[in-house]
From Swiss-Prot:
HAMAP family: ATP_synth_beta_bact. It catalyses: ATP + H2O + 4 H(+)(in) = ADP + phosphate + 5 H(+)(out). The gene is atpD. F-type ATPases have 2 components, CF(1) - the catalytic core - and CF(0) - the membrane proton channel. CF(1) has five subunits: alpha(3), beta(3), gamma(1), delta(1), epsilon(1). CF(0) has three main subunits: a(1), b(2) and c(9-12). The alpha and beta chains form an alternating ring which encloses part of the gamma chain. CF(1) is attached to CF(0) by a central stalk formed by the gamma and epsilon chains, while a peripheral stalk is formed by the delta and b chains. Produces ATP from ADP in the presence of a proton gradient across the membrane. The catalytic sites are hosted primarily by the beta subunits. It comes from the Bacteria. One of its GO terms (molecular function) is ATP hydrolysis activity. ATP binds at G168, G169, A170, G171, V172, G173, K174, T175. It is found in: Cell membrane. Keywords: ATP synthesis, ATP-binding, Cell membrane, CF(1), Hydrogen ion transport, Ion transport, Membrane, Nucleotide-binding, Translocase, Transport. This is ATP synthase subunit beta. It is an enzyme of class 7 (translocase). Its EC number is 7.1.2.2.
Length: 479
């Protein structure tokens, strides 16, 4: 495992050299070095810049060798105040971030500097550019990751060490699901979470930190932010920094890790900006020609090694709701499951507002989850799909015009729909309802009996915001 040291040397064992700034165009900086001192691609460089009498150190990352002993680098900060001829120090190593327990409960930038405190006592730093695990280190079996959230476990089960897309608009509950998953990993499984804020609003990042602190889940979480006001180089690398922290928890501390990336589209967008700045010819719809390669370099590191895993939950913005856009389409090829949040369900007050018909998973298959689970999930989806097909008729003619069989099915579907709601631990302070973790066996059995009509005699409202079927029976007694 690679760990940076206090006195870096290059891969060839030589002492890093000193270069000079030759040109500055926005975040792109060309630097001249002596012929035998050219730094390698991805090497971090340091240069001083002065604004209003205050000197600060800029970090650059080598992106290209452009000839004439010159490299082209991307700055991780604003380049205001940088002048031609300024000395540039080769660090001899890539950008490195702190790893280990010292990162828990803190917020970092792409360079590994803490944003919420002055300093963290980290003993180990790892470079953000790392290889994916070797093939013989990977976990060969496919295993379900039980969340204790009924709608997810039943209809769109997550894969341990897999990649899950979380799609939804503003205000439908993405942040609450993220907080709940962080809490469940920490409390139910003794795991740790890492959050990467990629190109999102600074206000949202601040709100998330404060809400997680209030909910009591911050102590088991490391957060890394590169927000939308940052240069494109920062937004392109922040996900790699967070992933590096997650890899340490998996490989060294032997923990299961949940990695959140919000928003993976901004990662692609930043790559497009950097590609244009470097003068590369754009590809389809103006995206970078290296889109698939950049996405693969990130996604292939998110996996299970023997006995331990990084499970990733990635928020996905879909431009103009076009699923064929190259950015989301490239992401979809790596995903094991999609959790789609539906505003229509949110408007009904049903949370989590997960669409049972649009969400999917590659392991919703009897080979992976067992025949009973598969049959129950498909029957639930069949009933809900039929209910959806009948809604236009109900709206125009009324429910009385349906056949007796369809009336029974509609009433059953409404009970199932409400039973898919569930109180969350992190929302207790708002709802006043204690959070519930529902074991998978109980979830399957409850929905199997629901689809068979065993609970048709209970009122609809009894199924709203409850954990297991026992809660529904208790609610019915109180109605």
């Amino acid at each position: 495992m690679t760990v940076t040291t206090s006195s870096p040397t290059t891969a060839e064992g030589r002492t890093p050299g000193i270069g000079r700034v030759a040109r500055v165009i926005g975040p792109v900086v060309d630097v001249e070095f002596a012929p035998d001192e050219l730094p390698e691609i991805y090497t971090a460089l340091h240069v001083d810049r002065t604004i209003d009498g205050e000197t600060a150190v800029l970090t650059l990352e080598v992106a290209q060798h452009i000839g004439d002993n010159t490299i082209r680098a991307i700055s991780m900060q604003q380049t205001d105040g940088l002048v031609r001829g300024a000395p540039v120090r080769d660090t001899g190593a890539p950008i490195s971030v702190p790893v280990g327990n010292a990162t828990k409960g803190h917020v970092f930038n792409v360079l590994g500097n803490p944003l919420d405190v002055d300093k963290v006592d980290a003993e180990t730093y790892w470079p953000i550019h790392r290889s994916a695990p070797a093939f013989d280190q990977l976990e060969s079996k496919t295993e379900m990751f039980t969340t204790g959230i009924k709608v997810i476990d039943l209809l769109a089960p997550y894969v341990r060490g897999g990649k899950i897309g979380l799609m939804g608009g503003a205000g439908v509950g993405k942040t609450v699901i993220i907080q709940e998953m962080i809490r469940r990993v920490a409390k139910e499984f003794g795991g740790v979470s890492v959050f990467a804020g990629v190109g999102e609003r600074t206000r949202e990042g601040n709100d998330l930190f404060l809400e997680m602190t209030e909910a009591g889940v911050i102590e088991d979480t490391a957060l890394v932010f590169g927000q939308m006001d940052e240069p494109p180089g920062t937004r392109l690398r922040v996900a790699l920094g967070a992933l590096t922290m997650a890899e340490y928890f998996r490989d060294v501390q032997k923990q299961d890790v949940l990695l959140f990336i919000d928003n993976i589209f901004r990662f692609t967008q930043a790559g497009s900006e950097v590609s244009t700045l470097l003068g590369r010819m754009p590809s389809a719809v103006g995206y970078q020609p290296t889109l698939a390669d950049e996405m693969g370099a990130l996604q292939e590191r998110i996996t299970s090694t023997r006995g331990h895993s990084i499970t990733s939950l990635q928020a996905i913005y879909v431009p103009a709701d076009d699923l064929t856009d190259p950015a989301p389409a490239t992401t979809f090829t790596h995903l094991d499951a999609n959790t789609v949040l539906d505003r229509a369900i949110s408007d009904l007050g049903i949370y989590p507002a997960v669409s049972p018909l649009d969400s999917n998973s590659r392991i919703l298959d009897a080979r992976y989850i067992g025949q009973e689970h598969y049959d129950t999930a498909r029957e639930v989806q069949r009933i809900l799909q039929r209910y959806k097909d009948l809604q236009d008729i109900i709206a125009i003619l009324g429910i009385d015009e349906l056949s007796e069989e369809d009336k029974i099915l509609v009433n059953r579907a409404r009970r199932i729909q409400r039973f898919l709601s569930q109180p969350f631990f992190v929302a207790e302070q708002f709802t006043g309802i204690p959070g519930k973790f529902v074991p998978l066996d109980e979830t399957i059995d409850s929905f199997r009996r629901l689809t068979q009509g065993d609970y048709d005699h209970l009122p609809e409202q009894a199924f709203f915001m409850c954990g297991g079927i026992e809660d529904a029976e208790k609610n019915a007694e109180n109605l």
